[in-house]
């Protein structure tokens, strides 16, 4: 008889149970290590300020408290500073007649938004603030932002209220007359990040890159202490 088979047959029930328990423990240990590795892989990578800047994100040394304001949401309802509470908001200033920068930015923001996991998307808002309130009425803004993503939101309102809000976020915009009698609007291309306390927290420089935005956004969220 083969020696190995003979040795196996000679093992007592207690020895066989011991071997089985050892195998089970080793398998469970391997599964635990694998689960820990996969969980770590899913965690955001914390990066330095220098890395943030190299990837297009500038985090304010101290988040800026915003003055109270009231704008008009694309739903037609009033929108106040309090609406930012409890959520992360990425705010871009643009307008529906913008020929290139705005649609490109909105499409990029949609690509970025789609890369986020479901839990992160749940408390992340993408908001377009109009710099052309004369033409961007709520219903028009509503259709425009939802063309890019049904979860996106739009804000418009009185010109001076929009201007004050933009100034607080260091986003310039100016009406520019055209030769044909019409006008366009020059505006900043950065995307501003407002934290769950409703404070100006950071901004993303143009040109935007969805992968870099995801990296920096997740790091900023992970280091936010409220």
How would you name each of these model-derived features?
Residues 1-66, 224-226:
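N-terminal targeting signals for export/organelle localization
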Residues 51-87:
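Short extracytoplasmic
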Residues 79-105, 109:
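Short active-site neighborhood of thiol/selenol oxidoreductases, capturing the structured segment around
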Residues 87-88, 105-128:
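Conserved helix-turn-beta segment immediately C-terminal to the redox Cys motif
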Residues 103-113, 138, 142, 159, ...:
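Extracytoplasmic/secreted envelope proteins and their assembly/folding machinery
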Residues 121-136, 151-160:
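Thiol-based oxidoreductase modules, predominantly thioredoxin-like and allied folds used
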Residues 142-188:
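Short, internal strand/loop/helix patches
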Residues 179-226:
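Thiol-/selenol-based redox modules, centered on thioredoxin-like
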């Amino acid at each position: 008889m083969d020696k190995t088979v003979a040795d196996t047959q000679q093992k007592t029930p207690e020895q066989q149970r011991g071997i089985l328990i050892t195998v089970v423990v080793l398998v469970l240990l391997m599964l635990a290590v694998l689960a820990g590795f996969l969980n770590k892989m899913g965690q955001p990578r914390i990066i330095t300020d220098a890395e943030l800047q190299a990837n297009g994100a500038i985090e304010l040394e101290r988040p800026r408290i915003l003055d109270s304001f009231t704008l008009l949401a694309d739903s037609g309802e009033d929108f106040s500073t309090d609406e930012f509470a409890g959520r992360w908001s990425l705010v871009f200033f643009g307008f529906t007649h913008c020929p290139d920068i705005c649609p490109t930015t909105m499409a990029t923001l949609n690509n970025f938004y789609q890369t986020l996991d479901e839990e992160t998307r749940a408390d992340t808002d993408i908001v377009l603030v109009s710099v052309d309130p004369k033409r961007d009425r709520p219903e028009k803004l509503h259709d425009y932002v939802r063309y890019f993503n049904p979860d996106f939101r739009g804000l418009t309102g009185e010109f001076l209220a929009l201007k004050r809000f933009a100034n607080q976020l260091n986003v310039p915009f100016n009406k520019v007359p055209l030769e044909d009698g019409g006008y366009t609007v020059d505006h900043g291309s950065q995307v501003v990040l407002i934290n769950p306390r409703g404070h100006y927290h950071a901004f993303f420089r143009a040109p935007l890159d969805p992968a870099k935005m995801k990296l920096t956004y997740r790091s900023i969220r992970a280091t936010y202490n409220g």
